[in-house]
Amino acid sequence: MSREVRAAIDGARKGGASEIVVNDSHWDMRNVLWDEMPADVRVISGGRKPLSMTQGLGEGFTGAMFIGYHAKAGDRNGVLGHTYTGETIYNVRVNGVECSEALLNAAMAGYYGIPLLLVTGDRVVAEHVTAHMPWVTGVVVKEGIGHYAADSMTPEAACKAIRDAAAQAVKDAPKAKPFTFDPPLTLEIDTTHAEQADFIELMPGYQRTGGRTVRFDARDYPEIFRAFTAAFRLGGAANVRA
């Protein structure tokens, strides 16, 4: 992971990027080896961030890059496919659009006027993202053989592909567009089990619309994103047996 992040940094610099922030976002959000990062890069690390994978976003950034992403829950041949948490979330829709982590996070960046420039991962997530954002450069570093198996590039080959693509993506940034959902906004979550929806509907603003489905209406996307983050965390409490 650290090598691929460093490759993206080096490529972005070659393309003209001057300031870079890394938000460590996989699993417990403590994966990136800081001593392998350039001295002038800022690193956001640690779990339970208020805005999770999108912590640190704000006005002033030229673009975002998603490194090491995966397919959404339920996608065939998506390597380790899930949407934030496989234990609790089966499907997420915003305004009727089925969303992966990449789409959910890209829309948060889009709220601040930041376009997604690059995504790396398996073919399934690359095709999912570019179908919604054709200006995004997708770097396919592995082909899924199933949920737990993949035909992958070597780390050296993957890093070269990421480095080259990141450089070009920064150069092409003026052609990219922020990804957004038009208001009014509706979030729908299908949980893995009905008991998780039992917990989520306890929160103000959520409506139960099905056995495993809840709905939340909002005025802007940050409200949608915060509601989603709260939902998967509270819904996860249903997985704990006292």
What are the roles of these predicted feature ranges?
Residues 29-32, 72-77, 124-129:
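Short, well-ordered, mixed-charge alpha-helical segments that flank or form enzyme active sites
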Residues 1-10:
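Short catalytic helix/loop segments, enriched in acidic residues and glycine
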Residues 39-43, 50-119, 137-138:
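Divalent-metal (Mg2+/Mn2+/Ca2+)-assisted nucleotide/phosphate chemistry catalytic cores
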Residues 28-41:
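Glycine-rich loop at the start of a catalytic domain that most often binds anionic cofactors/ligands
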Residues 111-116, 120-123, 127-168:
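Active-site rim beta-loop-alpha module in soluble metabolic enzymes
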